[in-house]
Amino acid sequence: MNPTFFVVLHSAALACAHTIFQRVYVDGVGEGHLSGIRIPESNWPIMDLSSNDIICNGGVNPYHEPVSLAIIQVPAGSTITAEWHPTIDDVNTTESIRPDHKGPVIAYLAKVPDALQTDVAGLSWFKFYEDGLSDDGSWATDRLIANAGKVNFTIPSCIQPGAYLLRHEIIAVHKAQTYPGAQFYMECAQLNITGPGSVVPSPTATFPGAYGSTDPGITVDIERLINYTVPGMPAEG
């Protein structure tokens, strides 16, 4: 085989294995492709838990320009559908992530002064959704694949209204026997949450820092797994 062709083929296969969060639906109504999300050009994972890139991506994976200035209007208590695909060309509408990339799917929110602010360091994130390994041996990523790259979760109905960032994440742990091995795919969407709520959720955590390299959900051999602990704090809905 021609070496150049092999490299191109190998790179294409790796790219198809990876994934990007690229569309939001609010109660079933689509917000538009790439709208309201900070989208990287590359679908490569973040693997360094100490890097600020673990917050909203970017950095080593520069954002697709122009970065969306849309703010997604979300009533508290509504259902969000997040859609994942390997590329951002809006052509692939069924593939999401390669089936061997097993792992959890997670969602966090952080209240911010401005949903368009570029400084995301030091934000207080609370987890409100997680899906990991089910009793039947299927993973959250299996369910994502079966649903053509879509996952649904409910925005808490009681939280304070205002500007938020939604940090949506897939952690692929198929090669996580040692650190760095787990692959972190995340993007942040810009939300304005409306409603009469007044609750300030807790506990919260900051990124970097929410995950440790020796956490049981980060360094794990899924071939010898009996049960799985989703990384981070418990999800509070």
Swiss-Prot record:
Binding-site positions, O2: 174, 183
Using the record for this protein, list the coiled-coil segments as residue ranges, or answer none: none
Q: Name one GO biological process term.
A: cellulose catabolic process
Keyword check for S-adenosyl-L-methionine: no
Cofactors, names only: Cu(2+)
Q: Please list the residues that bind Cu(2+).
A: 18, 101, 185
Q: Which cellular component, as a GO term, is one annotated location?
A: extracellular region
E.C. number, please?
1.14.99.56
Task: Give the note describing cofactor binding and stoichiometry.
Answer: Binds 1 copper ion per subunit.
Where does the protein end up? Secreted
What are this entry's molecular-function GO terms? Answer: metal ion binding; monooxygenase activity
Q: For this protein, what reaction is catalysed?
A: [(1->4)-beta-D-glucosyl]n+m + reduced acceptor + O2 = 4-dehydro-beta-D-glucosyl-[(1->4)-beta-D-glucosyl]n-1 + [(1->4)-beta-D-glucosyl]m + acceptor + H2O
Top-level enzyme category: oxidoreductase
Which Cys pairs does UniProt list as disulfide-bonded?
Answer: 56-188
UniProt cross-references to InterPro entries, sorted A to Z: AA9, AA9_LPMO
Main subcellular localisation:
secreted
Leader peptide range in chain numbering: 1-17
What keywords are assigned to this protein?
Carbohydrate metabolism, Cellulose degradation, Copper, Disulfide bond, Glycoprotein, Metal-binding, Monooxygenase, Oxidoreductase, Polysaccharide degradation, Secreted, Signal
Q: What is it used for?
A: Lignocellulose is the most abundant polymeric composite on Earth and is a recalcitrant but promising renewable substrate for industrial biotechnology applications. Together with cellobiose dehydrogenases (CDHs) an enzymatic system capable of oxidative cellulose cleavage is formed, which increases the efficiency of cellulases and put LPMOs at focus of biofuel research.
Q: Which Pfam families match?
A: AA9
User: Per its UniProt record, what PANTHER family does this chain match?
Assistant: ENDO-BETA-1,4-GLUCANASE D (PTHR33353:SF17), PUTATIVE (AFU_ORTHOLOGUE AFUA_1G12560)-RELATED (PTHR33353)
Physiological role:
Lytic polysaccharide monooxygenase (LPMO) that depolymerizes crystalline and amorphous polysaccharides via the oxidation of scissile alpha- or beta-(1-4)-glycosidic bonds, yielding C1 or C4 oxidation products. Catalysis by LPMOs requires the reduction of the active-site copper from Cu(II) to Cu(I) by a reducing agent and H(2)O(2) or O(2) as a cosubstrate.
**The protein's name in its UniProt record:** AA9 family lytic polysaccharide monooxygenase C
The top of its lineage is: Eukaryota, Fungi, Dikarya, Basidiomycota, Agaricomycotina
Q: Which gene encodes it?
A: LPMO9C
